[in-house]
Amino acid sequence: ITLHRLAELVLPLGWFVPVPPGEERVTVGGAVGADLHGPNHHRAGSFARHLLAFELLTADGTVHVVDRGTPLFDATTGGLGLTGVVLTATLQLQPVATSLLLTGSARATDLDDLMARLCDADLRHTYASARVDLLARGAATGRGTVLHADHAPPEALPARLARRPLAARPQLPAPPQLPPGLVPQLTPDRPLGRRALGLLHDLRHRAAPRRRAGTLRGLAAALPVLDGGHALGRGEGTVAYRCAVGHGCEDVLRHLVRRVADEGCATRPGLLKRFGVGSPGWLSFPARGWGLSLELPARATGLTALLDELDEEVAAAGGRVCLARDSRVRPELLDAMYPLLDDFRELRAAVDPSSVFTSDLARRLGL
């Protein structure tokens, strides 16, 4: 079952999933394998924090009941499906009083302003993230918009909605999108591409209100926006890059954003989050600090060299890339990014010595 469908089933009963997915296709088993995180990580942590137990089918055909605090639990949450197949899961849901969110936003002039506003939003709100303009340079490098939301209390609903506070709400229109096919024609490696995209990003930034609060939106419409699902445009072929660095590594984050902006290869905004307490998962991605998500055109000139450079800087700072979205990180950097990698390999060899459950990523990285 997908988390989206689970949320549809439990919301009328006054419950909601503890970590909302950014898209509809994420299954419960997939959320376990990726140790899913969302725009509420600064408060709620990742999916494993709300997972009480699960049943796991291992390669020898045995079904294990896996409880929290065990090595198999820690290897499987974030383990990318390499320890076995999750058959059932016992999950702690979160209570909600309505099916609506109170949303808001704040515009930031540069990356330091954006980080400061995101820190403030994390203290005040359940969900928070920030869109980063990756084409702005100079004094405006890293400018963007902080987005935040909270579950609306019944008293915040107008009378027509208060009569059925938990009713499913129709999806509201998404923010204006570029016409299909336009973004690929404006990618930075084509004539006028960077200038045209830069102008579009600039217009969008200037059109955004300096501050907005108290806008009611349905859960299904608001949460994908907070997780970057409605960011401006999508290229016809992109490489996902997700990295995390700890608190105190803000200079590293500044350099990553500046390098991408200087290359001018981004076609859509990046997504910045603050991560809270990390998960016990041995290969779990989120760790206390900052998370940056990028979608870059696969055909961008020099992209491989750029991402290799970012990998090295992230690893040197004690950070990591997200393996659930990776297709290219070099194996020799993995030990620095995931200190418990050898523990994972040892346990996986014990429960699946013939590598019945494997993947291209596992073979490439020697997991």
UniProtKB/Swiss-Prot annotation:
Residues 1-96 form the FAD-binding PCMH-type domain. InterPro entries: FAD-bd_PCMH, FAD-bd_PCMH-like_sf, FAD-bd_PCMH_sub2, FAD_lactone_oxidase-like, Oxid_FAD_bind_N, Vanillyl_alc_oxidase_C-sub2. One of its GO terms (molecular function) is oxidoreductase activity, acting on the CH-OH group of donors, oxygen as acceptor. SUPFAM superfamilies: FAD-binding/transporter-associated domain-like. Gene3D superfamilies: 3.30.465.10, Vanillyl-alcohol Oxidase, Chain A, domain 4. To M.tuberculosis Rv3790. PANTHER family: D-ARABINONO-1,4-LACTONE OXIDASE, L-GULONOLACTONE OXIDASE. This is Uncharacterized protein in mprA 5'region. The lineage of its organism: Bacteria, Bacillati, Actinomycetota, Actinomycetes, Kitasatosporales.
